[in-house]
Amino acid sequence: MPRSTRRMLLILALLAVALPAGAWSHKEHIQLTRLAAGRLMADPNTPADMKAWLKSVSPQVLTMDEERQYLMSARVGPFPRGVEGLPYWAVVPDLVAMTDGPGDSGRKIQPFDVPERMLHFVDCEYFNKDIERRRYRHDLSNKPKLYAFPTGLNDPHPDDKNYKPWAKAGMLPFRVEQCYAQLVENLRKKRLTDKPGQFPRDEHAARWAGYLAHYVQDNCQPHHSTEDYKSRAYFAEKRTAPNVHWDMEGRLVDDDNNDYPELRSEFWTVFAKALDEVKDPIDTIDLRTATVEVALVSYDALPTIGLAAMKAYEQGGTPDKPEGGVKGFDAGKFFHAKGKYLGRERTVLEIKAHQMAWSVKRVEKLWLRAWEEAKAPVVEP
């Protein structure tokens, strides 16, 4: 077998293993990023020069009717098809993570010195001082307080000077901060997009805006805030438990078959409404702290998602003591299950729509903030 063929088979095998453990699917990252760009271009308050830049780096903006059709029928798959500009850069972090391989074998991203996959989440339970509390519980009793998250990457836990939690917990807050800073720097240097004669070719604002969109969107996926990122706690057989992470995101919208058309249509209606109604409640300027705050809010959706998964797979027992085997996934039971989140009862479908709409609003906010910061005079310390 030729070496190139063996290499491609290896990559495909790694993708098959890694894809279900990702964040929002490629299709969702593409759509959320494109929506953020389109909404800013349509907003009369967006600076004209920013609109011109967005148009040049996101040329595939669609109408809402076209976006609905995209959600209903577009097939993207593990290798994104027909995508360019900001939406393309918004899926690159997942492509890097998937081709890195398992564990710590991937190329280390600096200055974090960890593989790409460690930059997509922050497992909140690791910020508990007591080791026995560093796991997810249905009653949210192991959800830490904001003060427990150290400021610096190598800073110890405020209540245990011998414990540095970031090394295990994931470094999403620091990656968001880094991408934002790189976006501002490239905007200031007028490195707006890839062009001949500009080197390095892939060092430009469009790349970092796409990366920033990706990580901000990941931040709004509840499973990216917990060590139990597949909701295995809700199943008796932990090792073979269903991947609820994937059920929550890509399963509904991007597959080889025309699955769940009624649910997709219902979701789009709820999501389109959420885009008009959802407000970003996070006003914190410091991006690391703001990212942690988003994770802590999203964390509260996990019990509803876990209980919905038990219903969808007919898992017996209780959340604290699941019993017996499971059956096939029932998407209707899963997405229509209800629980309390953000002060009112919501279905899982509504939670998914809310989180995705929230991510669009946060991407818009940070892109606009970066543009305005890049235009402002640099103040010397």
Predicted regions and their residues:
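Short alpha-helix carrying the canonical HExxH Zn2+-binding catalytic motif
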Residues: 205-219
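Bacterial N-terminal signal peptides that target proteins for export
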Residues: 1-9
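N-terminal, motif-rich segments that launch catalysis or mediate targeting to/interaction with membranes
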Residues: 22-207, 222-381
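N-terminal signal peptide c-region/cleavage motif recognized by signal peptidases
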Residues: 18-20
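Short, linear, compositionally biased motifs with a strong N-terminal bias
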Residues: 14-15, 37
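Alpha-helical interaction segments
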Residues: 12-14, 78-79
